[in-house]
């Protein structure tokens, strides 16, 4: 008897979630909601005119070959806060690259706050993340992306791997902001450079696009005193970059800055759980 071995493709996590909102009777309401695979969207009750969306990866993390796609469309006059249920963990990849793509559209007078909790990269993880945003001329947008190179309290380090983070932010079709971050191969050696992270293992980028950018700048800079970071504003755009020794230290700086850029509103409640 001849036994023929067949190659089995490893099971991969895939998901797609889509949320579109409209303004109805002065409140932000669901217009479309779609969930597929490991992607879930939950909408907690709110007590104002805004909508809070919590996106969930039911696979519990990502590894090479996994793919998640999210899209959010905020209709004219709506306000949506989008966050994650927990930190997204990117595990060691035996083959392939995990991909996460997020597309956001904000209509006239709309505001979208993209506030995922931290992404945790483990040693030999591989992730390519894309954020594509299209804003109306009068829309506001806030994005926060924080990354941890392992969990310092657990003794974890990231010596090698791949992390690509690509942002393209457009207003009325014209490009107003682009990010192209890449860590590959010797992650520990690269992040140790003074011009990169100076040996810190937690870092974040924040972008606010809206009419209050320059008005927020002074308050943001006062919060960054003594921290490894900086803020700049020009026109209707404010950018903040931060680095810290660990995730806890980063959060202590990050949360007050986010609150300023939300005009005093706190971070979503799931951040405190």
UniProtKB/Swiss-Prot annotation:
Primary location class: cytoplasm
Electron transport found in the keyword field: no
Family annotation (InterPro entries): UreD (IPR002669)
GO cellular component: cytoplasm
Subcellular compartments: Cytoplasm
UniProt cross-references to Pfam families, sorted A to Z: UreD (PF01774)
Record GO terms (molecular function): nickel cation binding
Cytoplasm is among the record's keywords: yes
Keywords, sorted A to Z: Chaperone, Cytoplasm, Nickel insertion
Protein task: Required for maturation of urease via the functional incorporation of the urease nickel metallocenter.
Subunit field text: UreD, UreF and UreG form a complex that acts as a GTP-hydrolysis-dependent molecular chaperone, activating the urease apoprotein by helping to assemble the nickel containing metallocenter of UreC. The UreE protein probably delivers the nickel.
Family label: Belongs to the UreD family.
HAMAP family: UreD
Identification of the protein by name: Urease accessory protein UreD
Organism name: Rhizobium etli (strain ATCC 51251 / DSM 11541 / JCM 21823 / NBRC 15573 / CFN 42)
